[in-house]
């Protein structure tokens, strides 16, 4: 039977519920337990797929093609369970399903209410998402006290009562602020946050107290006394210099022992040696490189969360400190390529819309002409093809139909024919709905033997995740190939371009898929590892 750990947050947002939850999951997994994780998002959007990166941050794509919260990226980086569409749902998704059932008449004329219909649907989805795991950690987004979170909190209150105390527990994250003028940490916000929880029928079993200063034993004892939580279940979680230390910090305070005893689970002790190696490699690099990351959402770096983490993982596998120089592509348009001088490699990530595209194209040209290692991802591949068409093939008007629908040389175009779930072909245009209408999820890619990308993966066929609706125009592909563009990766059926490489260049790879979604700190990712190796070679050349 599955045990449930419900995770809530109080006092303020952005306390790190996702990382704390994933770290506990990693310890339980290291004890031989089968673990999964769920994220429940209170916003009314059906999914984050159409939300602005500035508002939501990254949209993490699962293996089965769901557009989900970025916390699922943390989950997959910390545990080896692959997330699916069942591991993340929103208020919008819940209401959509309930209303669809109401329209069909499934409720037999009943008045549809938050309790029981919405809460029942939330509970159903939690149980489904947990599957056959030994332990499921269920993170509720937002902060206790938010109006939006109330149906989710009521649902977990009900589910906790239904399965019993031996199968469900509540872990609450709070802030214990340090007041510099008083020279002490303050426990009152935590006390009030727990009081808010208890007012809706939820008593925490574990408190994880976040702080930027050490929390002494007397403060933890005081928190335990005022919140009815066992003293050993009051966990101090001070800011760490790397998030990959968190499993070790939680384990050192006995959190996993408390959970295992509470659930009556029989399992081995935790072997965190893999995490010790990750932390050692992260904090003790032997080399250093600087890589320019040229994007358009630089005001909120969470928009590139998985990519930034993937570069960190590549640094770990290469024992290299990777310094990312974040450059807004519009700044290149306004200030020129001087911003790129002195870097060891250039990375151009994905994005949508016209703004900043010309700056990305200029960055590609700089990398290609100056033999600087280049990695393009999604839009980063499309602008690489556009740049090649303009400056090598001589098509000065070359573009994507996303940016210029009247270009005579549209080397990138919209996918117009799609197979729906039944296999029927439907036509989509620029005016079609944006939500859920992209090429999404894991798909096969055939690699060309002898190519740079094949040297990285050492495989003929790979599986990577996608999130896009524009592709390289096959009608103009013969001219691009004749001019020297190398097609080193194609879709499983050979119909679509997946990877391109530039001729006469030490390391220039651009891919249509998103490799960052499958990179992990323990295993890294072959493409990012190869990219950092190329940056190292460039650095040594420039030294």
Swiss-Prot record:
ATP binds at residues 14-19, 71. Allosterically activated by GTP, when glutamine is the substrate; GTP has no effect on the reaction when ammonia is the substrate. The allosteric effector GTP functions by stabilizing the protein conformation that binds the tetrahedral intermediate(s) formed during glutamine hydrolysis. Inhibited by the product CTP, via allosteric rather than competitive inhibition. L-glutamine binds at residues 351, 379-382, 402, 469. Its EC number is 6.3.4.2. Homotetramer. It comes from Pseudomonas savastanoi pv. phaseolicola (strain 1448A / Race 6) (Pseudomonas syringae pv. phaseolicola (strain 1448A / Race 6)). The active site is at residues 378, 514, 516. Pathway: Pyrimidine metabolism; CTP biosynthesis via de novo pathway; CTP from UDP: step 2/2. The gene is pyrG. UTP binds at residues 13, 186-191, 222. This is CTP synthase. Signal peptide: none annotated. Residues 290-541 form the Glutamine amidotransferase type-1 domain.
């Amino acid at each position: 039977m599955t045990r449930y750990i419900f995770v809530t947050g109080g006092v303020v947002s952005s306390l790190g519920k996702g990382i704390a939850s994933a770290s506990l999951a990693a310890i339980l997994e290291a004890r031989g337990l089968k673990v999964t994780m769920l994220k429940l998002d209170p916003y009314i959007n059906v999914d984050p797929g159409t939300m602005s990166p500035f508002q939501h941050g990254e949209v993490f794509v699962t293996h089965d093609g769901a557009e989900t919260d970025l916390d699922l990226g943390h989950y997959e980086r910390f545990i080896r369970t692959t997330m699916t569409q069942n591991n993340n749902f929103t208020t919008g998704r819940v209401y959509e399903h309930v209303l669809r059932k109401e329209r069909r008449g499934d409720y037999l004329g009943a008045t549809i209410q938050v309790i029981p219909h919405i809460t029942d649907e939330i509970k159903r989805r939690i149980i489904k998402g947990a599957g056959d795991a030994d332990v499921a950690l269920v993170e509720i987004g937002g902060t206790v006290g938010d109006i939006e979170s109330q149906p989710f909190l009521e649902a977990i209150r009900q589910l906790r009562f239904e399965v019993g105390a031996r199968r469900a527990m509540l872990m609450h994250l709070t802030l214990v602020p340090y007041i510099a003028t008083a020279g002490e940490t303050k426990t009152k916000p935590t006390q009030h946050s727990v009081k808010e929880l208890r007012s809706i029928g939820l008593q925490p079993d574990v408190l994880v107290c976040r702080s930027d200063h050490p929390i002494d034993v007397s403060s933890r004892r005081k928190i335990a006394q005022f919140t009815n939580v066992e003293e050993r279940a009051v966990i101090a979680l001070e800011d760490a210099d790397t998030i990959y230390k968190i499993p070790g910090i939680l384990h050192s305070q006995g959190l996993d022992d408390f959970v295992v005893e509470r659930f009556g689970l029989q399992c081995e002790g935790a072997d965190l040696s893999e995490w010790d190696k990750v932390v050692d490699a992260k904090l003790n690099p032997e080399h250093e490189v600087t890589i320019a990351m040229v994007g358009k959402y630089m005001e909120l770096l969470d928009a590139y969360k998985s990519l930034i983490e993937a570069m960190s993982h590549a640094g770990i596998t290469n024992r290299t400190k990777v310094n990312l120089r974040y450059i807004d592509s519009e700044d290149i348009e306004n200030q020129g390529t001087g911003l790129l001088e002195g870097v060891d490699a250039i990375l151009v990530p994905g994005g949508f819309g016209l703004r900043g595209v010309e700056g990305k194209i200029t960055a590609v040209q700089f990398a290609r002409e100056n033999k600087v290692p280049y990695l393009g991802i999604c839009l980063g591949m499309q602008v690489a093809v556009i740049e090649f068409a303009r400056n090598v093939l001589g098509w000065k008007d070359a573009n994507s139909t996303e940016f210029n629908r009247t270009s005579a040389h549209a080397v990138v175009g919209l996918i117009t024919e799609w197979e729906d779930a039944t296999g029927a072909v439907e036509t989509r245009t620029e005016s079609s709905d944006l939500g859920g209408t992209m090429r999404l999820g894991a798909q096969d890619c055939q690699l060309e033997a002898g190519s740079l990308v094949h040297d990285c993966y050492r495989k003929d066929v790979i599986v990577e995740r996608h999130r896009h609706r524009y592709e390289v125009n096959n009608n103009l592909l013969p001219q691009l190939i004749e001019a020297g563009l190398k097609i080193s990766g194609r879709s499983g059926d050979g119909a679509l371009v997946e990877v391109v490489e530039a001729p006469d260049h030490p390391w220039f790879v651009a891919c249509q898929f998103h490799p960052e979604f499958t990179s992990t700190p323990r295993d890294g990712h072959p493409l990012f590892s190869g990219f950092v190796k190329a940056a190292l070679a460039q650095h040594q050349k420039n030294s």
